[in-house]
Regions:
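Active-site metal-binding loops of divalent metal-dependent hydrolases
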Residues: 51-52, 103-106, 138, 164-165, ...
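Short, conserved loop/helix-junction motifs that constitute active-site signature segments
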Residues: 150-156
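Metallo-beta-lactamase
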Residues: 19-117, 121-125, 129-143, 163-219, 236-243, ...
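Bacterial N-terminal signal peptides that target proteins for export
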Residues: 1-9
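Cap/insert and terminal regions of metallo-dependent hydrolase folds
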Residues: 231, 235-321
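Bacterial N-terminal signal peptides
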Residues: 8-18
């Protein structure tokens, strides 16, 4: 069990006082925004898909900060301590295949979220067309959309997840050992991932090779035991999907040591984040981030001891930047 006592305590306290993605937090709304954004990446196309937005109390969600530091950094970005947090997934068109990175929430978090299928339809695609789904990790805002009730939502897709992640969350013995507040992640895996496994549509991978030409999983551990990034590369252009290693650009870019109550191993998550940010800033490739303001695509630029977020420049054609 890698959780430090400190992490377990902070998780327990946070879940008792506040569950940021609780149904009661959501206000009824439909997805009034278009919910998709196209961009070309070499011969590939990336289409950001919005699952919706939901209020998040970042001053309670973010931990390992000095007193008042989170509020101060949010204020500098004209953000309140409770912000509308995006839940993004990404459709990659690569070599004739339609590959989804994460699957949104489905009906798990109420009407403000659960719009991936709607966004996919608006972008011109149907769930039956999806060939593969690459999961960054097994949390409900990333795997919820795999199932609609007891039906597989993307019936023709093979689902990919790191072996470490699947082995951890699909093992009841690990649930028995986990702190009470973390047991629901195992329940989520049983509800959303086990049926995919039973249907013979789950593929697990080790790191070190491509899943498809130009598409490579990269170890990004800490937020969960087997959390994965995905690198896509075409014609010299690259984008790295960072999952949940970065939750708030306003707070965790200037101070990458600040962690999240949802981190399985907060220390490891901080180390992974610092390495990923340094590499992205040095190499200058694109990044896609699940909870940065939609479409969550941009660049990371070094700024003093930290970094700043440079969002993608809007392009009506999706072919210019
Ligand atoms: Zn997430």
């Amino acid at each position: 069990m890698k959780n430090s006592i400190k992490t377990m305590l902070s998780l327990a306290i946070a879940f008792v006082i506040y569950s940021p993605l609780a149904k009661a937090q959501n206000t009824p709304n439909s997805l009034n925004q278009p919910g998709y954004y196209h961009m070309a990446l070499g011969d590939f196309e990336v289409i950001a898909l919005s699952d919706g937005t939901t209020p998040q109390k970042l001053n309670e969600l973010l931990t390992d900060a000095k007193p008042g530091e989170v509020e101060h950094l949010l204020k500098q970005h004209y953000q309140a301590s409770t912000i509308e947090c995006s839940v993004n997934a990404y459709l990659v068109k690569a070599n004739g295949k339609l590959i989804l990175i994460d699957a949104g929430t489905s009906d798990v978090y109420g009407p403000a979220l659960g719009h991936i299928t709607e966004s996919l339809n608006k972008a011109g695609y149907k769930p039956e067309q999806i060939d593969a789904i690459l999961l960054t990790h097994i949390h409900m805002d990333h795997i919820g959309g795999l199932m609609n009730g007891d039906k597989i939502a993307f019936p023709n897709a093979t689902v990919y997840i790191s072996k470490i992640e699947a082995d951890y969350y699909l093992n009841p013995a690990n649930k028995a050992k986990a702190v009470e507040s973390a047991k629901r992640f195992f329940d989520g895996a049983e509800q959303k991932l086990r049926p995919i496994l039973i249907a013979g549509k789950l593929r697990t991978f080790d790191f070190g090779g491509e899943l498809f030409p130009g598409i490579t999983p990269v170890a990004g551990f800490g937020h969960t035991p087997g959390h994965s990034f995905y690198a896509i590369e075409s014609k010299g252009e690259k984008m790295l999907f960072l999952g949940d290693i970065l939750v708030s650009d306003a707070v965790q870019l200037p101070e990458p040591s600040i962690t999240s109550v949802y981190d399985y191993d907060a220390g490891q998550a901080a180390t992974t984040r610092k390495k990923a940010l340094a590499e992205a800033a040095t190499a200058g490739y694109w990044v896609g981030v699940s909870h940065i303001s939609f479409p969550g695509i941009g660049h990371i630029r070094a700024d003093g001891k930290g970094y700043i977020w440079v969002p993608i420049n809007y392009s009506a054609s999706g072919r210019g930047q």
